Amino acid sequence: MKRVVVTGLGVVSCLGNNQEEVYQSLLNTKSGITFSEEYKEHNLRSHVHGKPNIKLEDYIDRKVIRFMGAGSAYNYIAMSEAVKDSGLEEKDVSNILTGMVMGSGGPSIENVILASDKTREKNPKKMGPFIVPRTMASTASATLAVPFKIKGTNYTISSACATSGHCIGNAMELIQLGKQKIIFSGGSDEVHFAMTAMFDAMTALSSKYNNCLLYTSDAADEKRC
């Protein structure tokens, strides 16, 4: 089988909006968990989240971002960084031997709610046509394949918290088997109170340390809760 190497990375997270910011946060043991007034107002048990601090419109053209929910927008910014980091030229990115396997736990819940609200108001025309790509199950790959002109393999994997790992593993296999030469792979999800509320209802979120973020969702810490 063919050898597989990683040539470019990109990231948008609560620890930073690019490789260097995230790296420095990790070196300095900085937590990206912050208090959410919105969660408290909606009476969730957990009042904390790890939401990226970024103004999406500063990074993405208006004509591109209108197709995206926040999760896809994070992915777009990360992929832009990965392309630059890899040194790939446009002819390498837009090529029949270059594909994409991207994932998300689900579509943009914010836009699903918007569509539901407009329908209940008996005014569905007000939601507009761009809400479709934001809420498709394949939104993670579809909203990146078009602006980056991906011509090869292109699909979305969704497998809960294992999504990005499965995408990267599948991308590796496609290269090993010689089906694609280059694959862009990863995943993202938006942070929205409605999605959080579902996990909050099953008591899967941290609620013990709402006023002490030091221990909240701290990996490998026996006091985390």
Spans of features found by a protein language model:
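ACP-dependent fatty acid/polyketide chain-elongation machinery
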Residues: 1-64, 86
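Acyl-thioester C-C bond-transforming condensing/cleaving domain
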Residues: 17, 28-36, 65, 84-96, ...
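Glycine-rich beta-strand-to-loop/alpha-helix junction loops that act as flexible
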Residues: 9, 102-104
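Small disulfide-bonded, cysteine-rich extracellular recognition modules and tandem repeats
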Residues: 55, 219-220
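A glycine- and small-residue-enriched flexible loop/hinge segment at structural boundaries
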Residues: 38-88, 102, 137-151
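Generic hydrophobic secondary-structure packing signal
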Residues: 21, 71-78, 163, 167
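Residues that mark the start of a beta-strand
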Residues: 3, 97-99
